[in-house]
Amino acid sequence: MPKGTDRLIIDAPAAIGVARFKTLLKMADAVLLPVLPSAFDRGATGRFISHIESVKPIRKNRKPLGVVANMVRPGTRAGRRLMAFLDDLDYPPVATLRARTLYPELAEDGLGLFDRGDKAAKILQTEWTPLVTFIETLGADLS
């Protein structure tokens, strides 16, 4: 890891196989699994979780699995279905991030959400607090 780096996120492809997952897991302290509110994502997520729950570090909770409900529109049927699905899997989300037009605008400008301090960004930053806390708490547990 580069000097001065406290946290490093490795973005893996959605269709990663169990063998490649195990390789990446050796380098990781935890797994973050973003899930979109769609039937396709729910199906893929259910299958993926059933496969990785047999991997020893996940099964023994030595490498925590944090599910992130991503691009959720509150009050929609799709959002409710996603939350019910995650509840049924016994993986409540560590964070729920809403779908907002600010994200593509930030990407267009080459910025991240925490690069801006305006009201719109601050509102969305609060949604990230549980996820940041999950990651930072994990880091404290590993020290």
Predicted regions and their residues:
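P-loop/Walker-type NTP enzyme "switch/lid" segment
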Residues: 1-10, 14-18, 26, 107-118
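Conserved catalytic-core segment of NTP-binding enzymes
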Residues: 13-99
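C-terminal lobe/tail of nucleotide-utilizing enzymes
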Residues: 65-143
